[in-house]
Amino acid sequence: MKTNFLVFITFTILISLGFWQLSRLKEKKLFLASMQANLTSPAINLAEIQDGLPYHKVKITGQFLPNKDIYLYGRRSMSSEKDGYYLVTPFKTIEDKVILVARGWFSNRNKNIITQATNDRQHEIIGVTMPSEKTRIYLPANDIKNNVWLTLNLKETSKVLGLDLENFYIIAEGKDISNLDILLPLAINHLAAIRNDHLEYALTWFGLAISLIVIYVIYRRRYMAVDVIPRACSGIQKNN
């Protein structure tokens, strides 16, 4: 009886997890479709965003703040030099908002030249809003002293730069306003190419549930066979 109960509970949990993953599959499909629509639509002003900030194409006008650049480490497979940094600079809009903007990527050997990229002239930036990154325990801490960042956590960035930053940053589209050849433009079209593995997860849970039932049926049949043989032998002995 105890075994039956444990099997039933485990089977119910596995099936529930499978249906939960199917629900997540539907939610993620809608999310990716919405993101793709946002990325392919014309850029809008920040004030026009109604359904949350992340993954919208926006345009902002203002100026970069000098001497506030951040070097966010990242590998770039399309470059002959794999190791380098994303240039991230605070941008003060005409609405008096301060937003971090990821402007482009440069190789490690150009780190000393990239300081020429920032000026205080007014510019219009078009890009995609992104949420703050979370600090991950398996990554080293940001090297603030040498300005080498591994995680763009906006709360930490605000504290280090001494700025009241918005709770999102922007990946700029196209070539940077500096026109420096060493600063490679960032692509935004790939942002919606996120894997949706929830169907595989659902099939895994359903498969485990089916496997559990198969194993249980085999176990019950063998248990019943072992139980029947001694009783049959006992009956033969009594007849003798």
Swiss-Prot record:
Membrane protein topology class: Multi-pass membrane protein
Keyword Transmembrane helix in annotation: yes
Source organism of the structure: Rickettsia conorii (strain ATCC VR-613 / Malish 7)
One cellular component (GO) term of this entry: plasma membrane
Chain segments annotated as coiled-coil in the UniProt record: none
Annotated TM spans: 7-23, 201-219
PROSITE patterns, A to Z: SURF1
Subcellular localization, as worded in the UniProt entry: Cell membrane
PANTHER family found in the cross-reference section: SURFEIT LOCUS PROTEIN (PTHR23427), SURFEIT LOCUS PROTEIN 1 (PTHR23427:SF2)
Name this protein carries in UniProt: SURF1-like protein
Keywords from the UniProt entry: Cell membrane, Membrane, Transmembrane, Transmembrane helix
Family recorded in the similarity comment: Belongs to the SURF1 family.
